[in-house]
Design a protein with these regions (language model features):
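N-terminal glycine-/charge-rich "phosphate-binding" loop or analogous flexible N-terminal tail
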Residues: 1-38, 287
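Phosphate/diphosphate ligand-binding glycine-rich loop within oxidoreductases
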Residues: 34-110
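Short, conserved loop/helix-junction motifs that constitute active-site signature segments
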Residues: 47-55, 71-75, 201-206, 227-232, ...
Length: 302
């Protein structure tokens, strides 16, 4: 039977998933070679644990983005993330935010008068998705009924099913002026950090909308506030912010035509169920000597 440690704290749902995979969860000891790490905010604690246990050969991380653990994943061992696990709820949230923006829901919610009669439609629109992972794969399925023409910008411009065209990062500036809706769904790396700034917003149509369900620091927050208040773009919806959590009174809360959700594209209820599936899948594969799902590439950073 496989022995695996869960640190820093094991949760009942994950213990059950491990048992269903035929694994035994044990306290960390010198014989344990597999670790399921369940803390989202303490990379130093994981680093110290790995220093103390050089026998560990595989670490399962609980999140899709591993930017906070960029130094740790360079260690000579196998790391797997939860990338792809949360694709359905996150893509669903991105679609909901997109429709809310285009149908001017923020304005409708707060108004106390009949107001202007205006809305955009997602049907037959041009959509640019920045990033080409599991969330994008799911988004392409959700967008298909709207007859959208979707351009995917990704590091590896291999074609994606459902996309009108798939292009490399170097084509971003060329394609931004064509998009009615821009959705950020890429990993946060040194290449994508603060990539969306005043220069990128200036390339977008003044009627275009931005949706960020990736990472907050992919967007320069001050530049986004300026772009919204000066009507450089028509609106934005963000499930992630920089800083995060966004402090009360921060200027972004009062920017024009902004929707902010508190990183709830995947809630704890959803995460527990979906990450339990990943635990089961990878523990079974590990025990059988088969390839694991969600392997992290230390060079790419995701």
């Amino acid at each position: 039977m496989i022995q695996v440690a869960m640190e820093p704290k094991a949760f009942p749902e994950y213990l059950e998933a491990a048992a269903e995979a035929g694994a035994q969860v044990v306290p960390m000891n010198s014989k344990v070679k597999a670790l399921i790490w369940l803390d989202y905010s303490q990379p130093q604690a994981l680093a110290e644990l790995l220093d103390q246990n050089p026998q560990i050969e595989w670490v399962q991380l609980p999140f899709a983005g591993v930017d906070a653990f960029a130094d740790i994943i360079k260690r000579p061992m196998l790391f797997t993330s939860a990338k792809g696990s949360y694709r359905e709820p996150v893509a669903e949230h991105a679609l909901a935010l997109s429709l809310a923006l285009m149908r001017v829901i923020p304005e409708r919610v707060v108004t106390k008068t009949w107001g202007r009669q205006f809305a955009d439609s997602l049907y037959d629109s041009r959509v640019l998705i920045f990033g080409g992972g599991g969330i994008t794969e799911e988004l392409l399925k959700l967008l298909a009924p709207f007859r959208t023409k979707v351009t995917v910008i990704r590091k590896n411009p291999a074609p994606m099913q459902g996309a009108w065209q798939t292009l490399g990062f170097e084509q971003l500036d060329t394609e931004l002026p064509n998009a009615d809706l821009v959705i950020l769904a890429a990993a946060l790396t040194s290449e994508t950090r603060y990539l969306f700034d005043a220069g990128k917003f200036a390339l977008m149509k003044p009627t275009a909308y931005l949706v960020n369900i990736a990472r907050g620091p992919m967007v320069n927050t001050s530049d986004l506030i300026g772009a919204l208040n000066q009507e450089v773009i028509a609106g934005a919806a963000v499930d992630v912010t920089d800083p995060e959590p966004l402090p009360d009174g921060h200027p972004l809360w009062n920017a024009k035509n902004i929707i902010i959700t508190p990183h709830t594209a995947d809630t704890r209820k959803q995460v527990v169920r979906l990450f339990s599936d990943r635990i089961r899948e990878n523990l079974k594969a590990y025990g059988q000597g088969k390839p694991l799902v969600g392997v992290v590439d230390p060079e790419l950073g995701y």
